[in-house]
Regions:
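Bacterial N-terminal signal peptides that target proteins for export
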Residues: 8-23
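N-terminal hydrophobic alpha-helix used for membrane targeting or insertion
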Residues: 25-26, 54
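Acidic, Ala/Val/Gly-enriched low-complexity intrinsically disordered segments
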Residues: 2-5
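A sequence/structural signal for flexible, mid-protein segments enriched
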Residues: 35-300
């Protein structure tokens, strides 16, 4: 009986992984690639870059390819072929250059990353990303902002008769310079990967010197129909609010809007998503973050 239960659990996890792969690759195809009247005529697979470096952290890059929209059948079992595993990925701070090592890591999705322990991000520094795959060369540049956000948090019940809780970020910004922020959230302890929080791309041009910002749960494409942006009792929640540069802000704003504006991603808005990557789509972004961890308790 135990063996049967273990087998069912394994099959369930495999099915969830396959579905998540399908959803993510379809999103990258539908929202990152411009729509065209001849949807089958001009469809080509493109490289997608999801890379970041934060103050005090190591660079991490995930590289995939879009699933091209064609008239031919594409088996879900072949989606692993769209993870790029043999690229040469280099990060430079303008003085030193480091080649990142590709490896499998189940703490991320897709579970293959390029990283290194030989370079840490520093606030105020600029970092150059170069990706070489066959004859293709992809480049991007980002800067880690000098200042981390000045932020406090509070956790409150949504209402007196509700079992859901809301996390609020109390953000102060008295700098005269333009500042941009991105909120990420993570529920659970079995992953290292954060999701961009729902409506979590912020500019101080609209915030003023002080603002209270709801920290909504990140919305993944594999979420069920009963998704809620709030948190349940006993949820283990990690929140990251990061100062980012303007390019990163535009990318995350476009990306999260495309997800949040569509309950069915097959009918999502066809707007192109901003990218700071030359030769591919996606984003290479520097962050100066503040992280906070919560376990949601019953305050009734």
């Amino acid at each position: 009986m135990a063996n049967r239960e273990n087998t069912c659990n394994i099959i369930s996890k495999m099915t969830k992984t396959i579905r998540s792969s399908f959803y993510i690759l379809c999103l990258l195809t539908v929202t990152l690639v411009a729509c065209d009247d001849d949807i089958f005529g001009n469809s080509q697979s493109q490289m997608v870059v999801d890379g970041w470096i934060e103050d005090g952290g190591f660079p991490t890059v995930i590289i995939t390819r879009t699933l091209p929209i064609t008239e031919d059948f594409v088996s879900v079992n072949n989606l692993g072929d769209y993870i790029v595993k043999w690229a040469k990925v280099t990060v430079s701070d303008g003085v030193d250059s480091v080649v990142l090592t590709g490896k499998y890591d189940n703490n991320y999705f897709p579970p293959y990353i390029y990283t290194t322990g030989r370079m840490r991000g520093k606030a105020g520094h600029t970092y150059y990303l170069t990706i070489k795959e066959n004859d293709n060369i992809v480049r991007s540049v980002t800067t880690i902002p000098v200042n981390a956000p000045d932020v406090d948090f509070k956790v409150e019940m949504r209402s007196s008769n509700d079992s859901l809780y809301q996390i609020t970020a109390c953000l102060s910004d008295s700098n005269e310079q333009a500042d941009y922020y991105q909120i990420f959230s993570r529920v659970g302890v079995n992953t290292s990967q954060y999701s961009a929080a729902f409506l979590g791309s912020l500019s101080d041009a609209t915030l003023g010197d002080y603002a209270e910002i709801p920290v909504y749960r990140g919305k993944a494409l594999s979420d069920s129909v009963d998704y809620t942006p709030y948190y349940h009792i006993s949820d283990s929640v990690s929140v990251k609010i990061a100062s980012v540069d303007e390019d990163s802000f535009h990318f995350w704003s476009d990306f999260t809007n495309n997800i949040s504006l569509s309950s069915n991603f097959f009918l999502s808005p066809s707007n192109n998503i901003y990218s700071n990557v030359k030769g591919a789509i996606g984003c290479w972004y520097g962050m100066n973050p503040i992280e906070k961890h919560f376990v949601i308790a019953d305050h009734k």
